[in-house]
Amino acid sequence: MSAFKVSVIGGGSFGTVIANITAENGHDVGFWMRSESQAQELNRLHENSQYLPDYRLNERIHATSDMAEAVKGSRLIFVAVPSSSFRQVVSDMVPYIPEDAILVSTTKGIE
């Protein structure tokens, strides 16, 4: 299968690992994080120092706090946020989800 853009919504440890594995498999990854400063740090250092310090991340990951930018052009979107945030994050994302995108929830628990 040829490479396509994948998005990961949620900058915690699980989202970071999903983003990295996806990038290592040849896909460009739009990676949404709540914090713009953390997104900038990840883009600069290729590391998520808050959740996975000293773990080098693939350079195909592009972090942003802009939801529209994160999901634009994605064919597959992983949502990796806490269950307490899931409803709000997905509601915020709905206007930007490409029509043919597949949405996968990796959220543990029920709101």
Give names to the regions the model predicted.
Residues L57, E69-K72, L76-V79, S83-E111:
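Rossmann-like NAD(P)(H) cofactor-binding subdomain of soluble oxidoreductases
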Residues M1-P53, H62-S65, D92:
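NAD(P)+-binding Rossmann beta1-loop-alpha1 motif at the extreme N-terminus of oxidoreductases
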